[in-house]
Amino acid sequence: LGALVVTTTAAKGAIPETHPLSAGATLELEPTQRVLAAADIVLAVGSELAETSFWTSAASIRLGDQLIRVDIDPAQLVRSFRPDLAILGDAALTMAALTERLAGTPVTGAEERAARLWAENRAEHEVPETMNRCRMLNMLAEYLPENCFISLDSTQVAYTGASYFRIDHPNGWHFPNGFGTLGTGVPTAIGAKLGAPERPAMVIAGDG
């Protein structure tokens, strides 16, 4: 579609965050929320748009002049945010149909907006209170092998990394931000290795 893409933390890496149209899993950050509020249309695909994705109440969030939601579950189509248009269907099939229908429609400026938004959001983290976490995450990005599965406990590095660290492959970041469950990092990584033994795995553990 040629549009700027933002994901929830649960979908982190579903769209490679190194893609020029990606603005990462940054829904909780103020620069992204400004962009969403100013958008003509927000297309939400397969997302419950939960308060845990925004880290604030739904009442304080504005999702564009018009909101279109795509979901295979009728209940999810109206959860948290009531859309202007609800499309009940499989996400992959619906997006393929939309892409075909909109082929040739000129879209300009999205890559520049995504790059600018990445820079603004990273600046939100690169402040004295969180700079040490950013340094650690930048070192990990330099040395981690490709296609690595990262399993995280509910820890400050995870909170920062969810919107700061870039993942360029699906199922590469598992962080229990829904319930904030403690102690899931190691068992989740074990399960990931059992399911995909060819993939390297790393755990970031700790409380607080």
At which residue positions do the language-model features occur?
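DG-centered beta-turn motif at the end of beta-strands
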Residues: 198-208
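Short amphipathic alpha-helical segments
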Residues: 54-58, 80-82, 99-100, 162-165
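Phosphate/pyrophosphate-binding active-site segments
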Residues: 64-154
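Glycine-rich, anion-gripping cofactor-binding loops and their flanking helix/strand elements
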Residues: 1-68, 168-198
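Active-site diphosphate/adenylate-binding microenvironment
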Residues: 1, 115-198
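Structural motif
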Residues: 41, 149, 200-202
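Short gly/pro/ser/thr-enriched loop/turn and capping motifs at secondary-structure boundaries
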Residues: 11-16, 50-51, 74-78, 84, ...
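Short beta-strand segments
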Residues: 44-46, 71, 153, 204-205
